[in-house]
UniProtKB/Swiss-Prot annotation:
Every Ras-GEF domain range: 201-432
Main localisation: cytoplasm
Species in which this protein is naturally found: Xenopus tropicalis
Function: Functions as a diacylglycerol (DAG)-regulated nucleotide exchange factor specifically activating Ras through the exchange of bound GDP for GTP.
UniProt keyword Metal-binding, yes or no: yes
SUPFAM superfamilies: Cysteine-rich domain, EF-hand, Ras GEF
Gene Ontology biological process terms, A to Z: cell differentiation; small GTPase-mediated signal transduction
Gene that specifies this protein: rasgrp1
Name the record gives this protein: RAS guanyl-releasing protein 1
Annotated binding of Ca(2+) 2, by residue: 506, 508, 510, 517
Record remark on domains: The phorbol-ester/DAG-type zinc finger is the principal mediator of the targeting to membranes and is required for functional activation through DAG-binding.
Region annotation Ras exchanger motif region: where it falls in the sequence: 53-106
EF-hand domain location: 466-501, 502-528
Compartments in which it is found: Cytoplasm, Cytosol; Cell membrane; Golgi apparatus membrane; Endoplasmic reticulum membrane
Amino acid sequence: MGTVGKKKDRPTHGCSTIPKLALELKQIIHSTTHPKVPPVTPLRVMMPLGKLSKGASLDDLIQMCIQAFDLDGNMGQNSELLQIMLTMHGFLLPSTELLMKLRTLYQDALQNRSFSFCLRICYFIRYWVTELWVMFKMDAKLTQAMEEFQELVRSKGEELHWRLIDTAQINSRDWSRKLTQRIKPNCSKKRKVSLLFDHLEPQELAEHLTYLEFKAFRRISFSDYQNYIVSGCVKENPTMERSIALCNGISQWVQFMVLSRPTPQLRAEVLTKFIHVAQKLHQLQNFNTLMAVIGGLCHSSISRLKDTSAHVSHDVNKVLNEMTELLSSCRNYDNYRRVYNECTNFKIPILGVHLKDLIALHEAMPDFLEDSKINVPKLHSLYNHINELIQLQNIAPPLEANMDLVHLLTLSLDLYYTEDEMYELSYAREPRNHRAPPVTPSKPPVVADWASGVSPKPDPKTISKHVQRMVDSVFKNYDLDQDGYISQEEFEKIAASFPFSFCVMDKDREGLISRQEITAYFMRASSICSKLGLGFLHNFQETTYLRPTFCDNCAGFLWGVIKQGYRCKDCGMNCHKQCKELVVFECKKRSKLSVGENSSMFDSGQLEVIPAGGKGQTNDCLGAEEGPYSYPNGDGDIHTEVSKDRTIMLMGSSAQKISVRLQPAVKHRATQTENEPQSLCLQVPSPQRSRTPGLTSHLPISPMPSPCPSPVPTRKKAYAKWENKDSIRKARAELRGGKAGIQELEKEKALLKEENTTLKIQLKDAQRRVETLRAELRKYVLDSDVHQTGS
């Protein structure tokens, strides 16, 4: 498979495997000189070139373009040649050099007092600036040369000419005008949109994927196509790269949405849904996204799932085969080309197919003919191919987009996976069966191999923007009472719409998720999935833990007497047996540490009870708002975010809920040094006080950095503890090496009194807030009744 990022895969002169299209184009050009060759139907209607079919020099082409304007600035003949010259001159010389040639001609004409020719040159430049202002926006050297030319004209006293080539109109252009027009988002509040993948209809999903595709396709300019033809890759071509990355992202998203379901029946339901989405994309004539979806469904990581395929109906499989046949690369995509040419109005082509056509045409035809004349027919053919794609950008799609769903899909498509990771997850779902008979060879999968070398790697700023937009949309649709929280059940449904799972959610309030917590969740998950990549190759081994241990995947407790869970020998991750195949954290190999050292969960130390916000609290154990999250690979500065206390609900032997709160503890930036490692503080509030932020117990933890890549605070050196007076006193007595004296007991008594006072104050505050909320609720109910009575 070739890629756009590898120039070596491009066809070269003298190669024996020139694409069929290139040979056909040669026959079209030379059909007049070879009457015995059967004519091939031209791909586009071309204007008669006349004497230009034999080529022309660069100076002759410039002269013809200047003469295309009359003294009033109107265009006469050679108007299409003018378009070709301005858009395709990059194949011949840089834009700055073309402007310098025009400047030289202007100076010579002004010296010869040929004012009419000077006026035509100014009309030519004005047309260039007006119609192709994007070139000046993108090329700083061209803009500078234009300003110097303008100063030259003004210094000669030609005010009329100076006004014609005024560069102010370049800066007055709204750069985002073309990028935001023509697609009108649906701002109607009558229809409530669902952000849940399982609730989305195939038509709705296809329309919003088309919205994203057209938005990326519309941004590709003449210069972008031209740069790709010359370089053969998308390096330093961001608009082209974003379009290709979107195509690859959709293909990967389809695969991982299927693989994210645990059972064959559920995977078959998702697969069936995407086949119906493909049908709707075909009806919308969005062939590029159709290629991405079918390419994902036909990928070997999906096609090998025999148990899943067994639950797909015959009719659905028939539709998939029809779509695969439509997009087959056989006979140079003959089926697709036939259907595409029959389509009218709005349509989005398979960009890779047409880019291959452009490269084939560029390689098959020489740049110069005899006597070093420019091959004008080649420029004309390339212009027609590119112009057809550009004209499609002016046709608005027949749809209305809901921006909330657009934001959710945009974040979902920010993926970065490798082929090995796809196969690893596929084999985790359905392991290889060595006894199964060999599979009958089938049709080659539909994969956009031309774009496989481009990996969508959004930068952290883009990820943050996508996350914030998505979170705003979630709370707009699900936080109906506008209290800043959504339920745990709603969050789990929303999270299921993404092709990645993540750790247990942080909770400030039991059963409710705040805006800050859901933002932190998706920031961490998106950063791992879209930037760092994932490695599923953990070396898990069944392990017996001698001390209490938590699962690094679900944050649950590893219960049992022996062989409670699994431990990765490479990175030290701990997890349940049922979580072993669901781990999405990358395996980071660490320095060699003994099992005994890693298994020890807590170092002996002194237990201190420090009231929240009291004088005894030091900056070694700050609140959660002060503790920054540490990203792998040192990306903490980029992804700095405000994180809450991490609460885990455990069940004790007496069916009593125990709240274990974990929070990172980091020295203040002003006092932090490189030699002082981070530490963690385990806060174990009393079961009776688990719902109020009162007194917490701070357990000093070993500063050993966690080898586990989990972004949640490590629990390798911490354990849950049932907090009651007897256990606390007993632990303190053991740590102090003897029975507590009278002074220690008095201090503890005073400390408990201070804690009791703090809790009473917090209880009163909570009661006042409850009364306030009740009053607001009564007022809201009364207002609603009055409104209903009046209506």
